[in-house]
Amino acid sequence: MKLKSIIIATVGLLLATGCNSQNKQVKQTNMGKSIVIFFSHAGDNYAVGNIEVGNTKIVADYISEIIGTDQFEIVTHKYDGMAYAPLINLAKEETRKGELPEYEGDVDLSQYDTVFIGGPVWWGTYPQVMFTFFKKHANDLKGKTIIPFTTHEGSGLANCVEDVKAAFAGANVTKGFSIYGHEVRTEKTKVEKWLKGLGY
């Protein structure tokens, strides 16, 4: 009788574990296959000084680590080695003129259901090189979910969500997430909380 009770308890535990694993899998995949598209600026930055890894890349890496997304980094060498003040002046001119700097490589977005889009806030929106990417892929995200995020030092999301909505007509653009650049190295829990709120 004792052996029978042990067997029944063991089977029940295995079934419960299996159900929990199945529920966890559903939770992880209910947003479909995901990718993080981001631009990040290393080097001289406001509030954090000269950094080897850009603030936005740190957040992108958190997202990939926590929920297992792919990544595509929008890379341009136009700003390499620039001090913060001249960089921001250049960014202001690019924004004013609507310039579209070139970036390296590309990505096939057809396989993804959810796309995280992130970058720093420069003059009220994302850096112009991101708009180069937006223009190239303007018709690739119809019916997909876009989740914007920003790193900043006081601008929050600025106009980034509105600009993403304008760039990708027909996509489901969420309200977005922002975090201070000087916090990203110590506040991973904020990213975790945000992702948990999204259902991950």
Describe every region a protein language model picked out.
Residues 20-113, 190-200:
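N-terminal beta1-alpha1-beta2 submodule of the flavodoxin-like/Rossmannoid cofactor-binding fold
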